[in-house]
Regions:
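Metabolite-binding pocket within alpha/beta catalytic cores that recognizes anionic/polar moieties
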Residues: 1-106
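General structural feature for long, well-ordered alpha-helical segments within catalytic domains
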Residues: 39-42, 46, 59, 63, ...
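Active-site/ligand-binding-proximal alpha/beta "capping" segment
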Residues: 120-158
Length: 189
């Protein structure tokens, strides 16, 4: 299903199915046939379309390069943090004169509950996973220079990829739409 959004068209149609009896939706961020480079993906439309179709969690699958010596090609990594080195990408739903200034809590960019579920499922399936990694999100589509990789390592990054941002921030913004942030004034105590 192709869903129109206020932010333009998503990268492609959303495919619906089931895994182990649970409903899932799949959206190819680079388009079918891998035709959209990372800096041209309409991340806002993609995340909005998934949200409008009722997604309650997003598992983002991406190809990354390993910076950390103990991470080998083929290893499964579930990052816990992200550093954004991208620029010029539409990275918020809260912009324009009709929107108020909104700040999302991005201290933990990835949903803790969903990470635990993924780690538990991987363990149950006997899949070894690195559960502590910092993802460096770069602009693409070119690969990074050796000097850039050295910088990312000094900054604390463990893996490098091109699609982690603004995807994670946009998903967090929409997750906050239906979630209470704190007790209301007059209700604390």
């Amino acid at each position: 299903e192709v869903l129109r959004t206020p932010y333009g068209e998503p990268s492609g149609a959303i495919t619906f199915g089931q895994i182990c009896g649970r409903p899932v939706a799949f959206l190819a961020r680079h388009g079918y046939g891998h035709t959209i480079p990372p800096h041209e993906v309409n991340y806002r439309a993609n995340i909005w379309a998934l949200w409008k179709r009722g997604a309650v969690g997003i598992i983002s699958v991406a190809s990354v390069g390993s910076i950390r010596a103990d991470l080998r090609p083929g290893d499964v990594v579930i990052p816990h943090q992200i550093i954004d080195y991208t620029w010029g990408r539409k990275s918020t739903y809260h912009e324009g004169q009709q929107c108020s200034v909104t700040h999302i809590d991005f201290t933990e960019p990835y949903d803790r509950k969903l990470r635990v579920q993924l780690l538990t499922a991987a363990s149950s399936a006997g899949i070894a996973v690195s559960n502590s990694a910092v993802y460096a999100a770069t602009q693409g589509p070119r690969l990074e220079t050796a000097a850039e990789i050295n910088r990312f390592e000094r900054d604390g990054a463990d893996v490098v990829g091109m699609t982690g941002m603004p995807e994670a921030a946009l998903a967090r913004e929409l997750a906050g739409v239906t979630r209470a942030h704190e007790r209301a004034d007059g209700r604390r105590g």
